[in-house]
């Protein structure tokens, strides 16, 4: 099987100084792996969600000065794009990798979906494992572990999605670089698939409002 696990060199790409040098290595080393992950997991996500899912590898085309701090492949039920749609992501920063379900700032269903999340909060905390994390901003590496949050903190994230124009909501797993490097390829792929199986619950909720 083709090796798709992220390596130390993949993570180190995001420590290279300068836009052009970093983008060169990103295109040569990381992007082919993201493409393979996209091809590998699109059928899995299609089966889990009931929607045909298409992979979109981040291009970072609009950057002219600052190099990207992370990169990813996203999956959505459209060939044309993903940012306005509920979607999944696999990606990495220099310190960790992530597997996300995401509703980001361009989504038109945020308010309605936020209300549904609030109504389904008890179900969500049962379906989503405690070690999964939540984030209100895809551009920042930090996140909150669900087991460390009380119900009020989680509710605040759902309310924010309804009321703040630029609000986002992401849920998933973060794996530290050292843990990923020590996995074999099968463990890596299985970890991602297991996360997607749990996160598909959040996607199916979007099908009630989109």
Swiss-Prot record:
This is UPF0637 protein RBAM_014510. Belongs to the UPF0637 family. InterPro entries: UPF0637, UPF0637_domain_sf. It comes from the Bacteria.
């Amino acid at each position: 099987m083709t090796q798709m696990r992220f390596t130390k060199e993949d993570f180190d790409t995001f420590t290279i100084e300068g836009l052009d040098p970093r983008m060169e290595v990103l295109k040569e080393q990381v992007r082919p792996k993201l493409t393979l992950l996209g091809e590998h997991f699109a059928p899995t996500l299609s089966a889990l969600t009931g929607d045909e899912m298409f992979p979109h590898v981040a291009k970072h085309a609009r950057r002219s000065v600052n190099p990207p701090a992370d990169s990813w492949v996203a999956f959505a039920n459209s060939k044309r794009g993903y940012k306005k749609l509920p979607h999944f992501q696999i990606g990495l920063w220099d310190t960790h990798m992530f597997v996300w379900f995401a509703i980001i700032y361009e989504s038109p269903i945020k308010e309605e979906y936020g209300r549904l999340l609030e109504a389904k909060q008890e179900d969500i905390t049962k379906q989503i494992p405690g070690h999964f994390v939540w984030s209100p901003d895809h551009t920042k590496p930090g996140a909150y572990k669900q087991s460390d949050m009380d119900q009020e903190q989680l509710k605040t994230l759902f309310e924010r999605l309804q009321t703040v124009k630029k609000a986002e909501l992401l849920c998933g797993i973060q794996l530290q670089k050292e843990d990923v490097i020590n996995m074999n390829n099968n463990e890596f792929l299985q970890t991602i698939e297991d996360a997607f199986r749990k996160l598909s619950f959040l996607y199916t909720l979007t099908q009630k409002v989109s």
